């Protein structure tokens, strides 16, 4: 049995840290508004990105990290109540 811990790269650690931060903030928000599904949205988005973005596309991952950090700051605002999702019409 292999008991050596998994070693993550710096980028993987940054993504995991951002994910945990999002979940912590969303849990606090959902205590204020139990009908909110912020954590479900966050989990869905992270899983979607994990399946659609190649692990070797470091530039894309880094840009999404920056975008995610900005979004995290926004949801930490006491006035934040949820995400607005816009889906463009297909032609």
Swiss-Prot record:
Pfam families: Complex1_LYR. The keyword Signal does not apply. InterPro entries: Complex1_LYR_dom (IPR008011), Complex1_LYR_SDHAF1_LYRM8 (IPR045295). Transmembrane segments: none annotated. Coiled coil: none annotated. One of its GO terms (cellular component) is mitochondrion. It is found in: Mitochondrion matrix. One of its GO terms (biological process) is mitochondrial respiratory chain complex II assembly. CDD domains: Complex1_LYR_SDHAF1_LYRM8 (cd20268). Keywords: Chaperone, Mitochondrion. Plays an essential role in the assembly of succinate dehydrogenase (SDH), an enzyme complex (also referred to as respiratory complex II) that is a component of both the tricarboxylic acid (TCA) cycle and the mitochondrial electron transport chain, and which couples the oxidation of succinate to fumarate with the reduction of ubiquinone (coenzyme Q) to ubiquinol. Promotes maturation of the iron-sulfur protein subunit of the SDH catalytic dimer, protecting it from the deleterious effects of oxidants. May act together with SDHAF3. Belongs to the complex I LYR family. SDHAF1 subfamily. Interacts with the iron-sulfur protein subunit within the SDH catalytic dimer. This is Succinate dehydrogenase assembly factor 1A, mitochondrial. It comes from Dictyostelium discoideum (Social amoeba). The gene is sdhaf1A.
């Amino acid at each position: 049995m292999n008991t050596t811990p998994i070693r993550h790269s710096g980028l993987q650690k940054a993504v995991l840290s951002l994910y945990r931060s999002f979940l912590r903030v969303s849990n606090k928000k959902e205590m204020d508004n139990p009908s909110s599904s912020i954590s479900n949205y966050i989990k869905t988005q992270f899983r979607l990105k994990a399946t659609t973005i190649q692990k070797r596309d470091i530039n894309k991952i880094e840009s999404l990290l920056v975008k995610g950090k900005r979004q995290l700051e926004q949801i930490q605002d006491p006035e934040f109540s949820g995400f607005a999702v816009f889906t463009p019409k297909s032609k």
